[in-house]
Amino acid sequence: LHYAGELAKKRKERGVKLNYVEAVALISMEIMEHAREGKKTVADLMSLGRQVLKAEDVMDGVAALVHEVQIEVCFPDGTLLVTVHNPIENNGKLHPGEFILKDEDIVLNAGKEAIEVKVSNKGDRPIQVGSHFHFFETNKLLEFDREKRYGRRLDIASGTSVRFEPGESKTVRLIQFGGNQRIFGFNDLNNGQVNEDNKRKALAAAKAKGFIK
């Protein structure tokens, strides 16, 4: 234990963040050595054990793992058990896998004006549209007023989608694309900035390729 503690101490002095085993070994060694001197009480050593390491001295998550350190140490008058609860002060950082949730609900796409549009699937297979797909360029078997939906996407959470079953009609909400509003790819109807000039080109391409009849 003493050797492991000394090794951990040297690593700490070099700026190496300690792992779980090293942290426990260093705290235990410090308590053990001060107990041997006979100048401190059990209460003193419990306090000392919480001063050996800080959260920045250990690897992420170690402070949360070390709930307590218990060690039987030799005092001049015999062996006593020293227990140190939460020996490594947490600096408020997130623990691995931890979630911190807000008390209030999160408003999706807050501040963005949404419009509603009725969409019908005229095909014989389901059609699924992702959150950031340029709705103007969706499958040509989806029937809706495409011209007025240029530069818009679904008003749903990022990474989710809406599924249109064969023959189904449903109303969805659309919002303008954010950011720089540069749209590329999809069905190759618009490749560039969302503006009136590119809208005219996109409409012409949509009519030529059968997206608008």
Swiss-Prot record:
Keyword Hydrolase, does the record have it? yes
Which Pfam family is one of those matched by this entry? Urease_gamma
InterPro entries, per database record? Urease_beta-like, Urease_betasu_sf, Urease_gamma-beta_su, Urease_gamma/gamma-beta_su, Urease_gamma_sf, Urease_subunit
Q: Where is this region: Urease beta?
A: 91-213
- Which pathway does it operate in? Nitrogen metabolism; urea degradation; CO(2) and NH(3) from urea (urease route): step 1/1
Its UniProt entry gives the catalysed reaction(s) as: urea + 2 H2O + H(+) = hydrogencarbonate + 2 NH4(+)
GO BP annotations of the record are:
urea catabolic process
Gene3D superfamilies the record matches:
Urease, beta subunit (2.10.150.10), Urease, gamma-like subunit (3.30.280.10)
Q: What class of enzyme is it?
A: hydrolase
The Gene Ontology terms for molecular function here are: nickel cation binding; urease activity
Q: What gene is behind this protein? A: ureA
Q: Which domain of life is it from?
A: Bacteria
Concerning its family, UniProt says: In the N-terminal section; belongs to the urease gamma subunit family. In the C-terminal section; belongs to the urease beta subunit family.
Task: Name the Enzyme Commission number(s) assigned to this protein.
Answer: 3.5.1.5
Q: What is this protein called?
A: Urease subunit alpha
Q: How does it assemble?
A: Heterohexamer of 3 UreA (alpha) and 3 UreB (beta) subunits.
- Species this chain originates from: Helicobacter mustelae
Where it sits in the cell: the answer is:
Cytoplasm
Any one GO CC term of the record = urease complex
Keywords assigned by UniProt? Answer: Cytoplasm, Hydrolase
